């Protein structure tokens, strides 16, 4: 029957049981506490009533004592033998004590009466208090009016005795109530003790019952489950797991049984997979060894190619630098030729200016020659006139002769100068023609140098492009060399990984060999052991993590 009850239901029943016990014990203790509270309230009420009533009684007795002293003082004053306090002081004191007694009694009446107190006794006490209080007030009035005989004739002692008798009866009643409350409190305490004992016994019985139920429902099945789990942890999968209940423990046993069956299938699959992985890893390791040697050869060839490309790159860079310098020299020669052409053009222009100036000088010389010719004619005419004049014109004839000689010499000099200037003009014209021819030649030289400069610039540009292209080829070869080196490293790492995979497959097979299956009986599964060794290049290579392998393969 217990095997059909769910664990949750059992726990709920336990909680309900202990909750009911808690409520019952709480109710009993609350009832006892309530009774104790009521008894304590009665005791506190009686104590407060007695305290206030006792204080009021004492105040009344003190007021009567003060009035007696005042009456005696009044008689002594009449006989003129009095001393001490005056009558007025004693009367004032008596009034104050009566007022205090009234306040205490009023406070006493404000306290609620216990239902178990006798209302007749309370009413009688009130009447006797009122009589005594009124008598004492009347004594104060009589003594204040000087009615000493009426003062002493009043039966105050009888009123006091009646009040005392009623007061004592009231105290006896309260004493009985006090004792009843004490007895009730003791009885409540005893009941609480017995209730506690009974509750403890019931709780202990419930605990024993709950423990037995838990041991039957939870502990023993869980111990069986723990034993099965320990056997599974040790690799023993041959023991069946029984399912004897339909509660949570039964569900746990069924789940554990399902887990054992799945684990049996998993171990079988892992063993087969480990064997397959071991075989594949061995083949991968052999292939990686061959690939590693070929990759190393390829890396060596690429390294030689990279060195040759570096030398070719250096040579092309030198040619490009020489072409660049030749282009700069041609450009400088072109600039120099252009400057020479400009100088020749200036010379041509200057020769033209000289020819123009020589022509002007020839014109001026012609003018001088004409002036000399006219002067000669004038001198000849003067000589003729002097001859006609005879002796008187002899001196004028001499002067005219000298002028004629000078005119002839001037004409001769002008002719010679004209001839020289004409010859100079002819030579200047010839020089101008030659200079113009030289200017044209310099222009041709400048054009030729410009074309040479352009050609050298194109050669330098082509050399630069060729140098950059060879640089790019060199970089590509260097990158290929670097990638090949990385590939060689990756191949080595792959070979190491294959060897490690082979070793891990062997370890995995050995690990799953711990489990014992029903089909094997007492035979022990033997895992293959790796006896291959990695090549020297792989053995010296540093092991890396699986993530590094993946990153390197992505680079490859």
UniProtKB/Swiss-Prot annotation:
Family matches, as InterPro entries:
4HB_MCP_dom_sf, Chemotax_Me-accpt_rcpt, Chemotax_Me-accpt_rcpt_Me-site, HAMP_dom, MCP_chemotaxis, MCPsignal_dom, Tar_rcpt_lig-bd
- In this chain, the stretch annotated as The 3 Arg may form a positively charged pocket, which binds the alpha-carboxyl group of the attractant AA covers 64-73
Question: Disulphide bridges in this chain?
Answer: none
Q: What does the record say about its membrane topology?
A: Multi-pass membrane protein
Q: Topological domains (Periplasmic): residue ranges?
A: 31-191
Glutamate methyl ester (Gln): residues bearing it: 297, 311
Which GO cellular component does the record give, naming just one? plasma membrane
Could you give a single Gene Ontology term from the biological process aspect?
signal transduction
The subcellular localization recorded is: Cell inner membrane
Glutamate methyl ester (Glu): modified positions: 304, 493, 502
Function, as annotated, reads: Receptor for the attractant L-serine and related amino acids. Chemotactic-signal transducers respond to changes in the concentration of attractants and repellents in the environment, transduce a signal from the outside to the inside of the cell, and facilitate sensory adaptation through the variation of the level of methylation. Attractants increase the level of methylation while repellents decrease the level of methylation, the methyl groups are added by the methyltransferase CheR and removed by the methylesterase CheB.
Q: Which residues form the HAMP domain?
A: 216-268
- UniProt protein name: Methyl-accepting chemotaxis serine transducer
Named from the GO MF annotations, one term is: transmembrane signaling receptor activity
Q: Which residues lie toward the Cytoplasmic compartment?
A: 1-9, 213-556
Q: Which residues cross the membrane?
A: 10-30, 192-212
The record's listing under PROSITE patterns reads: CHEMOTAXIS_TRANSDUC_1, CHEMOTAXIS_TRANSDUC_2, HAMP
Q: Which Pfam families match?
A: HAMP (PF00672), MCPsignal (PF00015), TarH (PF02203)
| Methyl-accepting transducer domain span | 273-502
> Which species is listed as the source?
Klebsiella aerogenes (strain ATCC 13048 / DSM 30053 / CCUG 1429 / JCM 1235 / KCTC 2190 / NBRC 13534 / NCIMB 10102 / NCTC 10006 / CDC 819-56)
| Major site of localization recorded for this protein | membrane
Which Gene3D superfamilies would you find in this protein's record? Aspartate receptor, ligand-binding domain (1.20.120.30), Methyl-accepting chemotaxis protein (1.10.287.950)
């Amino acid at each position: 029957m217990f095997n059909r009850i769910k664990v949750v239901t059992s726990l709920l029943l336990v909680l309900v049981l202990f909750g009911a016990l808690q409520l019952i014990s709480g109710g009993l203790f609350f009832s006892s506490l309530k009774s104790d509270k009521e008894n304590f309230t009665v005791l506190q009420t009686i104590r407060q009533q007695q305290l206030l009533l006792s204080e009021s009684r004492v105040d009344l007795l003190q007021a009567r004592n003060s009035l007696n002293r005042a009456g005696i003082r009044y008689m002594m004053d009449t006989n003129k033998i009095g001393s001490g306090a005056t009558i007025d002081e004693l009367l004032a004191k008596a009034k104050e004590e009566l007022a205090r007694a009234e306040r205490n009694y009023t406070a006493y009446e404000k306290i609620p009466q216990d239902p178990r107190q006798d209302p007749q006794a309370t009413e009688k006490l009130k009447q006797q208090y009122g009589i005594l209080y009124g008598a004492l007030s009347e004594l104060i009035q009589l003594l204040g009016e000087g009615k000493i005989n009426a003062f002493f004739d009043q039966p105050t002692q009888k009123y006091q005795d009646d009040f005392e008798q009623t007061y004592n009866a009231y105290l006896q009643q309260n004493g009985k109530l006090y004792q009843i409350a004490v007895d009730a409190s003791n009885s409540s305490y005893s009941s609480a003790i017995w209730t506690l004992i009974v509750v403890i016994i019931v709780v202990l019985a419930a605990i024993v019952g709950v423990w037995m139920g838990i041991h039957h429902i939870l502990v023993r099945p869980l111990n069986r489950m723990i034993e099965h789990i320990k056997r599974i942890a040790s690799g023993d999968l041959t023991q069946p797991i029984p399912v004897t209940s339909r509660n949570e423990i039964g569900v746990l046993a069924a789940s554990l049984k399902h887990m054992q069956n799945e684990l049996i299938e998993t171990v079988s699959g892992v063993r087969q997979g480990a064997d397959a992985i071991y075989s594949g890893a061995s083949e991968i390791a052999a292939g990686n060894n061959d690939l590693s040697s070929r990759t190393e050869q390829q890396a060596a060839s690429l390294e030689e190619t990279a060195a040759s490309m570096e030398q070719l790159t250096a040579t092309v860079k030198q040619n490009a630098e020489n072409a660049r310098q030749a282009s700069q020299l041609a450009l400088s020669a072109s600039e120099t030729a252009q400057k020479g052409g400009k100088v020749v053009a200036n010379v041509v222009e200057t020769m033209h200016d000289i020819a123009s100036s020589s022509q002007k000088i020839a014109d001026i010389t012609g003018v001088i020659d004409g002036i000399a010719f006219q002067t000669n004619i004038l001198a000849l005419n003067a000589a003729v006139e002097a001859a006609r004049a005879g002796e008187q014109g002899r001196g004028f004839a001499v002067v005219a002769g000298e002028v004629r000689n000078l005119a002839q010499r001037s004409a001769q000099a002008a002719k010679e100068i004209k001839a020289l200037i004409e010859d100079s003009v002819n030579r200047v014209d010839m020089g101008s023609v030659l200079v113009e021819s030289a200017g044209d030649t310099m222009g041709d030289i400048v054009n030729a140098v410009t074309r040479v400069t352009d050609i050298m610039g194109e050669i330098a540009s082509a050399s630069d492009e060729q140098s950059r292209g060879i640089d790019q080829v060199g970089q590509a070869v260097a990158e290929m060399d670097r990638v090949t080196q990385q590939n060689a490293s990756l191949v080595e790492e792959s070979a190491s990984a294959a060897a490690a995979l082979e070793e891990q497959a062997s370890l995995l097979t050995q690990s799953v060999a711990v489990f014992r299956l029903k089909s094997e009986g007492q035979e022990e599964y033997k895992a293959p052991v790796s006896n291959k060794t990695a090549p020297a290049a792989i053995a010296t290579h540093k092991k890396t993590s699986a993530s590094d392998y993946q990153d390197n393969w992505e680079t490859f």
